[in-house]
C-alpha cells in the first residue's frame, strides 16, 4: 500500500518576482569611480597651476653686459600680461585646494547632485580664467620667441634664453591645468546624467 501526498503549487513564484523588483541594486555605481578620478585629477591640477604661477613669478634674467645708463633685464613684472597670468594661476590654485573637500563629499555620496553641480559651475568659471591667462601669456611668449616683422618687434629670446624657457614652461603648465579642467567638467557632466 503506497500513499501519495499531493502538494499544491505555492504562490512563491509571484512573491519572488516582487522581491526581485524591489531588491534591484541602485544604478550608477560607476559614479563613485568618476568621483575618485575627479579627486585625482584635482590633485594633478593642484600641481600644475601653482607650478605655472611660481615658474612665471620667478622668471627673471639680467644680461651680463650693461651701459653706463642701461641695464638689460627681462622680468615677468615688465609685462602686464605675465602679471595677470601669475595672479590668475594663483587664484586657480587656491580654488583647486578649496574644492578638494567638495570632491571628497562627492566620493562619499556619489549620487548627491548639489556638490557636483557646485563644482561643475565653479570649474567652468576657473577654466575660463585659466584659459584666458594661458592664451594671453602664450601670445606674449610667441612674440618673445619670434617677434613681429610688421610692427618691428624684435625677438628677445636670442638674448634672454633662460627667461623665455621659464615663461614657456609656465604657459605649458597652465595649459595642462586647462586640459585637466576640461576633463573635470566632462566627467562631472556625465555623472550628473540621470541614467
Swiss-Prot record:
> Which Gene Ontology cellular-component terms appear in the entry?
Casparian strip; plasma membrane
Segments in the Cytoplasmic topological domain? 1-33, 108-116, 191-195
Localization terms from the record: Cell membrane
GO-annotated biological processes:
cell wall modification; cell-cell junction assembly
Q: Which InterPro entries match?
A: CASP/CASPL, CASP_dom, CASPL
Q: Which residues lie on this side of the membrane: Extracellular?
A: 55-86, 138-169
**Keyword RNA-binding: yes or no?**
no
- What membrane topology does the UniProt entry give? Multi-pass membrane protein
| Superkingdom as given in the UniProt entry | Eukaryota
Mind telling me which residue stretches traverse the membrane in this protein?
34-54, 87-107, 117-137, 170-190
Major localization class: membrane
Q: Which UniProt keywords apply?
A: Cell membrane, Cell wall biogenesis/degradation, Membrane, Transmembrane, Transmembrane helix
- Cite the NCBIfam families for this sequence: A_tha_TIGR01569
Q: Which family does it belong to?
A: Belongs to the Casparian strip membrane proteins (CASP) family.
Physiological role: Regulates membrane-cell wall junctions and localized cell wall deposition. Required for establishment of the Casparian strip membrane domain (CSD) and the subsequent formation of Casparian strips, a cell wall modification of the root endodermis that determines an apoplastic barrier between the intraorganismal apoplasm and the extraorganismal apoplasm and prevents lateral diffusion.
Q: How does this protein assemble? A: Homodimer and heterodimers.
Name this polypeptide is given: Casparian strip membrane protein 3
What is the source species?
A: Glycine max (Soybean)
Amino acid at each position: 500500500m503506497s500513499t501519495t501526498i499531493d502538494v499544491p503549487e505555492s504562490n512563491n513564484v509571484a512573491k519572488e518576482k516582487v522581491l526581485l523588483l524591489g531588491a534591484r541594486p541602485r544604478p550608477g555605481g560607476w559614479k563613485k569611480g568618476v568621483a575618485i578620478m575627479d579627486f585625482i585629477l584635482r590633485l594633478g591640477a593642484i600641481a600644475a597651476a601653482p607650478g605655472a604661477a611660481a615658474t612665471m613669478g620667478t622668471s627673471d634674467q639680467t644680461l651680463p653686459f650693461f651701459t653706463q645708463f642701461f641695464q638689460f633685464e627681462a622680468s615677468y613684472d615688465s609685462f602686464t600680461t605675465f602679471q595677470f597670468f601669475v595672479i590668475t594661476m594663483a587664484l586657480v590654485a587656491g580654488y583647486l585646494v578649496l574644492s578638494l573637500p567638495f570632491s571628497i563629499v562627492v566620493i562619499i555620496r556619489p549620487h548627491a547632485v548639489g556638490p557636483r553641480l557646485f563644482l561643475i559651475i565653479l570649474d567652468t568659471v576657473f577654466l575660463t580664467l585659466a584659459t584666458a591667462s594661458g592664451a594671453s601669456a602664450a601670445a606674449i611668449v610667441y612674440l618673445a620667441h619670434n617677434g613681429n616683422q610688421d610692427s618691428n618687434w624684435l625677438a628677445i629670446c636670442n638674448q634672454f634664453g633662460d627667461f623665455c624657457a621659464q615663461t614657456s614652461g609656465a604657459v605649458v603648465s597652465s595649459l595642462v591645468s586647462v586640459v585637466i579642467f576640461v576633463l573635470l567638467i566632462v566627467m562631472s557632466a556625465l555623472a550628473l546624467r540621470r541614467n
